[in-house]
Amino acid sequence: MSITTHLDIVSAEHEIFSGVVEMVVATGELGEIGITPGHAPLLTVLRPGEVRITLQGGTQDIYYVQGGMLEVQPHCVTILADVAERAEHLDEAAALAAKAKAEAAIASKGGDIDYSVAAAELARAVAQIRAIQKTRKKMK
C-alpha cells in the first residue's frame, strides 16, 4: 500500500476534486512544486498552470488552475483556486484564440494597450494550452 495524503481542489464555484493522492505537482510563484505525503507545512501563491495529481495506483489526472493558493498541512493539501477545471474540459480553440489576441495586443504599438493585462491573458492562454497538450499525451 502506498503512502498517501488527502487533496481538495476548490474553486469559487464548486469543489473540483476531493480524494486521496500519492503526489501533487502545481505551479507556484517560484516555479513547480511537488508535494508528497509528509511534506513540510507550506502556504504559497499559485500561478496559472496545471496541477498534476497522482492517484493511488499511479494514475495521473491533470487540472488547470487560474491562480489561487496552495496550503500543505501534515495530512491534507488544499488548493483554493480562482478558477479550476479538469484539463480535458478546456476549450482548445478558445485558448488558441485568446493566445493570438493577447500576442496581437502585445505586438501592437498603440498607447491604449495595458501590457500587464495582455501579458496575464497570454500566460493564462499558454497555461491552458499546455494542460490540454499534456492531457492528450496522457490519453495516448
Curated annotation (Swiss-Prot):
Bilayer topology: Peripheral membrane protein
Pfam family, one: ATP-synt_DE_N
InterPro entries: ATP_F1_dsu/esu_C_sf, ATP_synth_F1_dsu/esu, ATP_synth_F1_dsu/esu_N, ATP_synth_F1_esu_C, ATPsynth_dsu/esu_N
Keyword Ion transport: yes
GO CC annotations on file: plasma membrane; proton-transporting ATP synthase complex
Subunit structure of this chain's protein: F-type ATPases have 2 components, CF(1) - the catalytic core - and CF(0) - the membrane proton channel. CF(1) has five subunits: alpha(3), beta(3), gamma(1), delta(1), epsilon(1). CF(0) has three main subunits: a, b and c.
Task performed by this protein: Produces ATP from ADP in the presence of a proton gradient across the membrane.
Entry similarity comment: Belongs to the ATPase epsilon chain family.
Name used for this protein in its record: ATP synthase epsilon chain
